[in-house]
Regions:
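Single, function-defining residue in the core of a domain
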Residues: 2-47, 56-61, 120-121, 138, ...
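Short, positively charged, Gly/Tyr-enriched micro-motifs
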Residues: 35-101, 183, 227
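Active-site-proximal, Lys/Arg-enriched surface segment
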Residues: 52-58, 88-184, 296-301
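Short gly/ser-rich anion-binding loops that grip negatively charged ligand groups
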Residues: 60, 77, 165-169, 200-203
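Poly-acidic low-complexity segments
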Residues: 66, 97-105, 109, 235-238, ...
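Short coil/turn segments at secondary-structure boundaries
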Residues: 67-71, 103, 356-362
Length: 449
């Protein structure tokens, strides 16, 4: 009898929490819904709100964003065609564009920048690029050749398996860029996404798209933020753009790219640091390998040929057999403490790697089967909005709700999983399980006949 009462109490609490989280969702997206309500029929706006919740409920990497699957969750299996038609009308409506949701993400980035302003801490805008692969598709609009990261990963040599790797594989797909706003600690905020192609009438290239975004960020946040770029941005053209826009940056330089030393010599990055001992050592946590590494740091003044202004090269050595980080920055370095700030700032770049992986694997960004580019970008923008909400649940003020959700709807025996500071995967699974068991009252009642 006691166990029955406990289960009944948990069930009542779960139904209440399902409504609470649904209300939090509405509060999160209310500003953008209000703007869309001025342009769209209220039924389409309601479909957008319902679709956001249904996307969280439908967890499947291959079919997560297939409209027929989403339609089945929206109105129930018996009315799946009607649910699919509702979503299709929303995505194909000519009265709104994906830019409305992308602008809303920019505003969330503005809020994050204002929230993170602190005299002793920097604010980071972390960039990274990726691709969305559609290897079996030929009919979708704006498909272009992209280098398959999946094929590259599968062709790595494994111990005991002797098939030699081949050259790079190129498949149909789209290019993709993502920006996060983050502080020295805590979760990052999704601020912007952009997709483009290299073929057709809308053909563009990476540097053109990235330059447009850099100019927009420079106008928006100026020198309040520090830009974090990986090796894909290394080179004189991009450094020149950063200097022209007067932005603060930390760029991981390639070891074989040349720099000019204070003596006027033109040397590769590794040659600039050759023979110089580290100035200091400390333990740095490796987010990727989940361990601490004894890391040494060295910094020296350098210049990039054809680029005006003094820059600094910070070298972080994390042990024998591991490639050092060569970090190029225009931040003034006067002591070792300033050099460590650069190293710790770049270590935050792992946040955007996790965000891209989460978008692809957990939110199924590569699964849509839409041909029209406008409809496709609208769906991606809606999913990005869902991702932004899930990240917002990591706020410290929501810790009791988050803890309850994980304990009751995604309990795990693994100690490492229980101690994860940002359990986004478990959080989405728990929320999906909760809403499937206790459907929010804001969603249409499913028809089972």
């Amino acid at each position: 009898m006691t166990q029955h009462r406990e289960k009944e109490a948990v069930g009542q609490g779960s139904a209440h929490q399902a409504e609470v989280i649904s209300q939090l969702w509405y509060v999160f997206v209310r500003p953008v819904l209000g703007r869309l309500h001025q342009e769209l029929d209220r039924r389409l706006v309601q479909t957008l709100l319902d679709l956001l919740q249904v996307i969280v409920m439908q967890r499947h990497r291959q079919h997560g964003l297939v409209l027929t699957e989403l339609g089945g969750h929206l109105l129930g299996p018996a009315q799946a065609p009607a649910g699919t038609k509702r979503i299709d009308r929303l995505l194909k409506s000519s009265h709104w564009q994906a830019a409305a949701l992308i602008d809303f993400l920019w505003e969330k980035g503005d809020e994050a920048v204002q929230r993170l302003i602190h005299p002793q801490d920097d604010i980071y805008v972390i960039w990274d690029e990726s691709v969305l692969e559609k290897p079996e598709s030929l009919k979708a609009e704006r498909l272009g050749p992209v280098r398959s990261s999946k094929a590259r990963r599968l062709l790595r040599i494994k111990p005991g398996f002797y098939t030699p790797p081949t050259g790079p594989a190129f498949v149909p797909g789209w290019n993709w860029l993502q920006l996060l706003v983050a502080g020295p600690r805590g979760p990052a905020t999704l601020a912007h996404l952009r997709w483009w192609t290299t073929r057709g009438q809308a053909a563009s290239d990476k540097r053109t798209e990235e330059t447009q975004i850099l100019q927009q960020v420079a106008r928006r946040w100026g020198r309040q933020v520090v830009h974090i770029w990986d090796q894909g941005f290394a080179g004189e053209p991009w450094v020149s753009q950063a200097v022209q826009q007067h932005v603060r940056f930390i760029l991981r330089w390639k070891k074989n790219y040349k720099l000019e030393t204070v003596t006027g010599q033109l040397l590769k990055a590794w040659e600039c640091a050759r023979g110089k001992r580290s100035m200091d050592h400390r333990l740095i946590y490796d987010s990727r390998r989940r361990c601490e590494r004894d890391t040494g740091v060295l910094y020296l003044p350098v210049r990039v040929p054809e680029v005006p202004g003094q820059l600094w090269l910070v070298v972080a050595r994390s042990g024998q057999g591991r490639t050092p980080w060569y970090l190029l920055t225009n931040e003034p370095l006067t002591d070792v403490a300033a050099a460590w700030r650069v190293v710790l700032a770049y270590s935050r770049r792992w946040q955007v790697e996790m965000s891209l992986r989460y978008s692809k694997s957990e939110l199924a960004f590569e699964s849509p089967r839409l041909r029209a580019w406008d409809a496709l970008t609208k769906l991606w923008a809606i999913v990005a909005l869902a991702q932004a909400f899930l990240v917002s649940l990591l706020d410290d003020g929501l810790e009791p709700l988050r803890t309850w959700l994980l304990q009751h709807w995604c309990a795990r025996a693994d100690k490492r999983l229980r101690k994860t500071k940002a359990p986004l995967y478990r959080l989405r699974l728990a929320l999906s399980s909760l809403w499937l068991a206790y459907r929010p009252s804001t969603l249409p009642r499913p028809c089972l006949d």
